Curated annotation (Swiss-Prot):
The chain crosses the membrane at residues 100-120, 141-161, 167-187, 203-223, 245-265, 285-305, 325-345, 354-374, 381-401, 404-424, 432-452. The lineage of its organism: Bacteria, Pseudomonadati, Pseudomonadota, Gammaproteobacteria, Enterobacterales. One of its GO terms (cellular component) is plasma membrane. Signal peptide: none annotated. This is PTS system beta-glucoside-specific EIIBCA component.
Amino acid sequence: MTELARKIVAGVGGADNIVSLMHCATRLRFKLKDESKAQAEVLKKTPGIIMVVESGGQFQVVIGNHVADVFLAVNSVAGLDEKAQQAPENDDKGNLLNRFVYVISGIFTPLIGLMAATGILKGMLALALTFQWTTEQSGTYLILFSASDALFWFFPIILGYTAGKRFGGNPFTAMVIGGALVHPLILTAFENGQKADALGLDFLGIPVTLLNYSSSVIPIIFSAWLCSILERRLNAWLPSAIKNFFTPLLCLMVITPVTFLLVGPLSTWISELIAAGYLWLYQAVPAFAGAVMGGFWQIFVMFGLHWGLVPLCINNFTVLGYDTMIPLLMPAIMAQVGAALGVFLCERDAQKKVVAGSAALTSLFGITEPAVYGVNLPRKYPFVIACISGALGATIIGYAQTKVYSFGLPSIFTFMQTIPSTGIDFTVWASVIGGVIAIGCAFVGTVMLHFITAKRQPAQGAPQEKTPEVITPPEQGGICSPMTGEIVPLIHVADTTFASGLLGKGIAILPSVGEVRSPVAGRIASLFATLHAIGIESDDGVEILIHVGIDTVKLDGKFFSAHVNVGDKVNTGDRLISFDIPAIREAGFDLTTPVLISNSDDFTDVLPHGTAQISAGEPLLSIIR
């Protein structure tokens, strides 16, 4: 992980070129000082990186489901610390759209997983009520519903923190302003203000428009922005001896009243206007809206434009109490699942089959980047078929005007979130039908087109015969075994990062002797600081990664000893690393050791030798050029 982090930091132009870094479910999202210093093409070819996307003012590196681990490694390697998670105070670069997407993604990205979790929990509770497994009066329901509803009820406080960080202000000051919006005294004043004989509320004689700000989104975002501006001015003007407490004091005294008097009513009016406008457009042509959103959603995601729609969805929940956009996106997700399953069925390469299968599984839960970038998009036609299938499914859902009643990532869980308080109705069944059509059409279309293209290839003229150059070990520069032990097929390795082949083709060994010896003549290209992995580049350009054990990076070098340094010249059979097998096993780690060809894409194929047991120095892999 550390080696991948080093390559990523180098690929984005070095630590000094990083302004800020955050991550979502599958991507590292960099804000760079100078994007021209980034080496996108180099990063795209780096094992462990699925894709690189430059969009929305961000340099995005698509990693996959283990992005959180890579984020921590990059943070450590680059020495970013808190800077990695904070936004710059001002971002004046890029066009208006890029700046908008950058701000919105920074505010909502940290909350997406939690919002999805609370949405799923609400859907499960709705399902339980529908089948009468519980009642609204039961303690179990009340406690779990409180957990599912708390995030949105106190949204102004939570968004105060993320918006405060994004705008470069003190996030805790913005949180307090958000807390004022949903304080019990304010909510009580709002309820009393609904009565016919209620007296109005004023601030220093200025009348206050009483509104319910629970679950609101836009007011606190504007307030956090204003607060950050005032805070910077005050920090510049006030003496350092008093600004630590006078700055937040003055911000609260100024911004809180301004929020209640001006920002809150104005932004609430804007929220209602946006919701009414969206509802009018949607109700005018719901089926067409479904076709557009279902067909183009994944394209929006590729370019990072989907972040501009997240506030719209959340605003719909705040103003309308439901959202009609998320149901339209669910078929787009299901279609990517179907296309990936089609590739899984048709693919003959065992490792690529594993990649397609695991990508389809993660897509079911709304994480489509592995399926899009690792499976469907590189093959082109599965991605196109998935977009068309998503449009078909979403057209049906749009026609039925299906709604969801809680926020969540478009996924298999969306079906539960479409259940209204009155129970399962036609709109729920429409979402099921739309999802099934999307996944079914994408699967069938991908399989059919695969067989059609496979039949046409021989008719295009027989290709010229080319005898592949096979490098067999050890005489002709092939790969010898670096260990003595039992051969394990790569697809049986417990870590899917290795098993999927994303880091390169190869084989694994369960060692019986605690030594790693050089499999080739060459030089040491890399040696991890924790000594659990080493990279060797052979004299004829084959790059080999030997990773001793699974998750052994957590040992932090304990039980490992290195006998070489980076840059050393080595011969076949030279001792590279020693390790204590009993101690590592006693610590609870799997010693299965992947031996990978990192630059597998440079060769026609990498073939393991068929043997169950092997000794160090015996033939292990053949490279076909």
